[in-house]
Amino acid sequence: MPLRLDIKRKFAQRSERVKSVDLHPTEPWILASLYSGTVCIWNYQTQTITKSFEVTELPVRSAKFIPRKQWVVAGADDMYIRVYNYNTMDKVKVFEAHSDYIRCVAVHPTLPYVLSSSDDMLIKLWDWENGWACTQIFEGHSHYVMQVVFNPKDTNTFASASLDRTIKIWNLGSPDPNFTLDAHQKGVNCVDYFTGGDKPYLITGSDDHTAKVWDYQTKSCVQTLDGHTHNVSAVCFHPELPIIITGSEDGTVRIWHATTYRLENTLNYGLERVWAIGYIKSSRRVVIGYDEGTIMVKLGREIPVASMDSSGKIIWAKHNEIQTANIKSIGAGYEATDGERLPLSVKELGTCDLYPQSLKHNPNGRFVVVCGDGEYIIYTALAWRNRSFGSGLEFVWSSEGECAVRESSSKIKIFSKNFQERKSIRPTFSAEKIFGGTLLAMCSNDFICFYDWAECRLIQQIDVTVKNLYWAESGDLVAIASDTSFYILKYNRELVSSHFDSGRPTDEEGVEDAFEVLHENDERVRTGIWVGDCFIYNNSSWKLNYCVGGEVTTMYHLDRPMYLLGYIANQSRVYLVDKEFNVIGYTLLLSLIEYKTLVMRGDLDRANQILPTIPKEQHNNVAHFLESRGMIEDALEIATDPDYKFDLAIQLGRLEIAKEIAEEVQSESKWKQLGELAMSSGKLQLAEDCMKYAMDLSGLLLLYSSLGDAEGVSKLACLAKEQGKNNVAFLCLFTLGRLEDCLQLLVESNRIPEAALMARSYLPSKVSEIVALWREDLSKVNPKAAESLADPEEYSNLFEDWQVALSVEANTAETRGVYTAAENYPSHADKPSITLVEAFRNLQVEAEESLENGNIDHEVAEENGHVENEGDEEEQQEEEVNEEEGVVDADSTDGAVLVNGSEVLTPHP
């Protein structure tokens, strides 16, 4: 049966001819050396070029990363080896290495060594800790040495491939080869070692169009791989999968089974001849170099083949080797830390006759099924004995221990608990996947159909593209995961049972309302498990989340890809495994899950009984959950974090609680936030206290001016000046009518030009003094400009109404300290504004006109004997009052100006 590997192209980039490729172990980088003389580093995640080195004008036939030094080493046809720092782009070393083209460079995995092979038929060893000195030369080949590669199982030895048709095995301590393999009928282009621990194999590729697998201990050919129609230019044993990859000048890459040597797949991306294949350990990515560019593919899934039963026993597969570990073997004395790798004792359980692609315990943990290569085998979990086997693409367990096998897209078999075939189904559609659990599910590309296990009756068809399916242990809830989101559905078991008991016919879409969609979440689920009514999963961003009642909580941010194994209730821990089979645990309290579940069901009494069992450090988590359910009052009672509790109190308008928290925390931002809420709520005394604590001087100015609190404004002016808040201090002083202090503040703030303009507007008598200061200050930077400043005392003709302004200042000086009560504002609000200079001038004009008219009328009155002395006296008294208060005649189009709550005359600038 075929290996059935998923092959996905992850990177494609056209370029000049690619002669070698390499993958970085930690960065998402592909290193490609080109025939044009350039070495490029591509980022396969962003699909962009990250670095580029112009090495030479001749071909660079080999380049490799040296990650532990942040270097790239490259060998070219100009016979030089060059070393670059790929971070700084600096050239670290350049030296002439050979007397002919350099075909290959190989980096020792641990020691500071680099091997190079050349058309001069020599292999040389270079030590970078010894100034890149050549410490050894290996002679023996009689033609070009095309490739050298270190043995990963014994890094003191290496193999070389030559066009003299041989493979030679060398030891770093000896200039002579250990032995020679007469490998092919024509020149050998490439060689690679098998990285697994069980086979002493290497593979070679030749111009005779074949690749051969060799046992280097017996020095015999194990298998010849025929199929290419041109020279085989690149070969490799994949480090993670049981496959051999060969590339040829016929333009194809062929994938062979490493055990059966069966051809599994052939790739042809239409980029002409294949020259290089690159891979790294612990990755399923393979990069291929062609005449016209670079391709990277991902083979299979990176999810580790592992399963854990409810007791904490884990079984996993490393290639064909089966290993086991038990979490409970650590002991109760071990204090587990979240995110820390568990020190498990790993034991060899046995081997598997097929290459495992999936492994799963049955519900009671007694059996384990392994699937792969189109077959399945059921083993006993303890002794690893073969219990049953058969052909099948997929195998699933029911929640009761029955099982189903998908033999093809048109045939599914159901087996009893004793693994006896009970039923065979031929669905009316192409079944691409099956899932087990409470119901048997079959998927096409567009929908999923649920069937009961007993009689395979259709329960319901749901139109959704399904990637995975997770049943809760109760059988009442199911999570359906697609490529971009997941859905939580409720299975109405009683409704379905009553439907079938009634004998009513079932239509093609199944039982209506068999499933009810409870929640939908736009997150991609990588792996998931249920704990009660809580769905735990990790998403595409590698966050470990759990979902209760549609509310998603992030437990932890994972620092690398990890996959869920299961949950052990008596430890309140969820366990995950990474690609290296490291097991990691995280705390998830069962009491917390139960509490949230009861709240979702509306059973608050039982939830409150569980609350005391939840540790205090988790109460904020509970409070956030309650807030999301709209239970803000309850959240406020439970919350322990002062910041969060303060936000809840503000949200509820509980100002006293918020004040207590603010007093405890003494946070300026909290006082300010509380002050704004108190102001909007009419709690003016609290607002004042908050603004004082928060040093919100602008808010205090607004409050005091609104209240007409002159004393408060006066104190605020002093405080603002101390705090350096000159704008607030100026407004306070101006509001109080303390114009001299305003001028002084401007001068002290070195705002002398503004002080001069203010003096001209409000205190003309101070202009000369300020102008003198201005001249003195300006003369330091521009003497000519300083001389051009005009003093009104010297040039009064340049200042309109100067004498009038002085008179107005003298007449209004006494009124600046008088403040009209705020309650009288309505009687002053409608009066028009006018400059006091203009008002003063109007008064003078009216007085003159009144005087002239008054003399004529008096003479006429004397002649007629009708002198109305009484009326004249009243008018005179009214004029005197108006003159004292600075009020213009009500019949005039001009009016008084309100300054600081008092009617005063303001001079015109």
Curated annotation (Swiss-Prot):
Complex formation: Oligomeric complex that consists of at least the alpha, beta, beta', gamma, delta, epsilon and zeta subunits.
CDD domains found in the cross-reference section: Coatomer_WDAD_beta-like (cd22947), WD40 (cd00200)
GO biological process: intracellular protein transport; vesicle-mediated transport
Biased composition (Acidic residues): 870-892
Subcellular location: Cytoplasm; Golgi apparatus membrane; Cytoplasmic vesicle, COPI-coated vesicle membrane
Species, as recorded: Arabidopsis thaliana (Mouse-ear cress)
One GO location term (cellular component): COPI-coated vesicle membrane
Protein name: Coatomer subunit beta'-3
Membrane topology type: Peripheral membrane protein
Homology family: Belongs to the WD repeat COPB2 family.
Region of interest: Disordered: 862-909
Renumbered ranges of WD repeats: 13-52, 55-94, 97-136, 140-180, 183-224, 227-266, 269-309, 351-390, 461-501
Molecular function via GO: structural molecule activity
Cited InterPro entries: Beta-prop_COPA/B_2nd, Coatomer_complex_subunit, COPB2, G-protein_beta_WD-40_rep, TPR_COPA_B, WD40/YVTN_repeat-like_dom_sf, WD40_repeat_dom_sf, WD40_rpt
Described purpose of this protein according to its UniProt entry: The coatomer is a cytosolic protein complex that binds to dilysine motifs and reversibly associates with Golgi non-clathrin-coated vesicles, which further mediate biosynthetic protein transport from the ER, via the Golgi up to the trans Golgi network. Coatomer complex is required for budding from Golgi membranes, and is essential for the retrograde Golgi-to-ER transport of dilysine-tagged proteins.
Chief subcellular location: cytoplasm
Keyword line: Cytoplasm, Cytoplasmic vesicle, ER-Golgi transport, Golgi apparatus, Membrane, Protein transport, Repeat, Transport, WD repeat
